[in-house]
Amino acid sequence: MTVRVGDPELVLDPYDYDFHEDPYPYYRRLRDEAPLYRNEERNFWAVSRHHDVLQGFRDSTALSNAYGVSLDPSSRTSEAYRVMSMLAMDDPAHLRMRTLVSKGFTPRRIRELEPQVLELARIHLDSALQTESFDFVAEFAGKLPMDVISELIGVPDTDRARIRALADAVLHREDGVADVPPPAMAASIELMRYYADLIAEFRRRPANNLTSALLAAELDGDRLSDQEIMAFLFLMVIAGNETTTKLLANAVYWAAHHPGQLARVFADHSRIPMWVEETLRYDTSSQILARTVAHDLTLYDTTIPEGEVLLLLPGSANRDDRVFDDPDDYRIGREIGCKLVSFGSGAHFCLGAHLARMEARVALGALLRRIRNYEVDDDNVVRVHSSNVRGFAHLPISVQAR
């Protein structure tokens, strides 16, 4: 069944602030009433059921990444790979890029980063816990992931606050803005210039960091260009920074609203990875990803023409009662396994999934070791407004320090 946007009963608008506040009732209706949805005004299609989203991730032949994964019109060009790297490529270009990047972005490098993540978490917690109440996003979750990326790629300590501010500006959207706004464009250009200078510096003086490893990566004489490395570093800001910030805040928010489950995590820190996984399922940071239909595609007896935009909705898929029991219950420790689609699937499975999970585990563990309990100030919570990322711009909490 296809429901068109002219139907006043059901409208999916990824730019709508009411949708950002709580998309899940919309998703439920889409899964039940319009598993293939058409929005004429915004000119996109969408699939919401777990099976369809999973197949969409896995079928990189029928569904192309070549124009990127954002619905924002300015982002959907054949040049998207210049800022979104492999996320805006199809094979064989995607496979080449991913193979070369993987030579530097290794599981071992991520494992060896864990002590630095713990130290960065300690530094930010030392500052935040000077008071009993603070904004968890502004003082911790919004700082740590970008600082981890900066640590990984070799950004000096003195530049990290500036880089965090630029990363925030790249992603911010005002109410009603359905494209990349000029301030985000300007921040993107400044960030790319900074990374170009960083790459040039490490080409002259290699160091023990990811940027130098990417410069050295080689496969049968093939190497990454400076432009390709720059695009990958920028991708980490988009795909690795913001999503992890939102994961941390989402975990803290939802556990606070399920105090019995939070108490079990406080009592047994081995449950922290389960806390992370259930948050990834229940309220994933990455809610909506776009694909371009590579050739006429038939779903639910409806033909989607070549060149059309099809949105995959992992935020909906993770709440599909066809796959998960009681999906609207936040239940730390539930069996999730390979059913999770928060990191995608197939050829484009998120290269940074292990980094995000490690960061969240380390950061939340560091927090719980420093406090006895916390509460969220619900009256002053502010959500971020983005067409594809879900989380909090401000999450004020009060804590009981140990």
From Swiss-Prot:
Its cofactor is heme. GO terms for biological process: cholesterol catabolic process. GO terms for molecular function: cholest-4-en-3-one 26-monooxygenase activity; heme binding; iron ion binding; steroid hydroxylase activity. Heme binds at C350. It comes from the Bacteria. Keywords: Heme, Iron, Metal-binding, Monooxygenase, Oxidoreductase. InterPro entries: Cyt_P450, Cyt_P450_B, Cyt_P450_CS, Cyt_P450_sf. CDD domains: CYP130-like. It is an enzyme of class 1 (oxidoreductase). GO terms for cellular component: plasma membrane. Its EC number is 1.14.-.-. The keyword Heme applies. Belongs to the cytochrome P450 family. This is Putative cytochrome P450 123. It comes from Mycobacterium tuberculosis (strain ATCC 25618 / H37Rv). The lineage of its organism: Bacteria, Bacillati, Actinomycetota, Actinomycetes, Mycobacteriales. The gene is cyp123.
